Amino acid sequence: MGTSLLCWVVLGFLGTDHTGAGVSQSPRYKVTKRGQDVTLRCDPISSHATLYWYQQALGQGPEFLTYFNYEAQPDKSGLPSDRFSAERPEGSISTLTIQRTEQRDSAMYRCASSL
């Protein structure tokens, strides 16, 4: 199971960057000062029920943050602190918000979707 999940995640990331269709994220890049709030948006493939958020620090592999099945958030165990929150209110577009950003929040944030 671990190998197939890893392959799926890699394909999910390829889909966000290298194809013109599929999952889209905005803003593409965000630079902020410490202490400011940041909200990232993910628009998954329209027929996909499940949406995942990952954090990838420089030189590290992706770390799971949370996922949604439609608007339900069954697992948010990966969200690093109470400053991180995610929502998907209508089962489509999702947002990831980081409040009062800190230096250690510096990373690439990715979303992926699946059936």
UniProtKB/Swiss-Prot annotation:
Name by which UniProt lists this protein: T cell receptor beta variable 7-7
Leader sequence segment: 1-21
PANTHER family assigned: T CELL RECEPTOR BETA VARIABLE 7-4-RELATED, T-CELL RECEPTOR BETA CHAIN
Disulphide connectivity of cysteines: C42-C111
Keyword field: Adaptive immunity, Cell membrane, Disulfide bond, Immunity, Immunoglobulin domain, Membrane, Receptor, Signal, T cell receptor
GO terms of biological process kind: adaptive immune response; cell surface receptor signaling pathway
Pfam families: V-set
InterPro entries: Ig-like_dom (IPR007110), Ig-like_dom_sf (IPR036179), Ig-like_fold (IPR013783), Ig_V-set (IPR013106), TCR_beta_variable (IPR050413)
GO cellular component: plasma membrane; T cell receptor complex
SMART domains reported for this sequence: IGv
Domain of life, source organism: Eukaryota
Role played: V region of the variable domain of T cell receptor (TR) beta chain that participates in the antigen recognition. Alpha-beta T cell receptors are antigen specific receptors which are essential to the immune response and are present on the cell surface of T lymphocytes. Recognize peptide-major histocompatibility (MH) (pMH) complexes that are displayed by antigen presenting cells (APC), a prerequisite for efficient T cell adaptive immunity against pathogens.
SUPFAM superfamilies tied to this protein: Immunoglobulin (SSF48726)
Localization of this protein: Cell membrane
Quaternary data: Alpha-beta TR is a heterodimer composed of an alpha and beta chain; disulfide-linked. The alpha-beta TR is associated with the transmembrane signaling CD3 coreceptor proteins to form the TR-CD3 (TcR or TCR). The assembly of alpha-beta TR heterodimers with CD3 occurs in the endoplasmic reticulum where a single alpha-beta TR heterodimer associates with one CD3D-CD3E heterodimer, one CD3G-CD3E heterodimer and one CD247 homodimer forming a stable octameric structure. CD3D-CD3E and CD3G-CD3E heterodimers preferentially associate with TR alpha and TR beta chains, respectively.
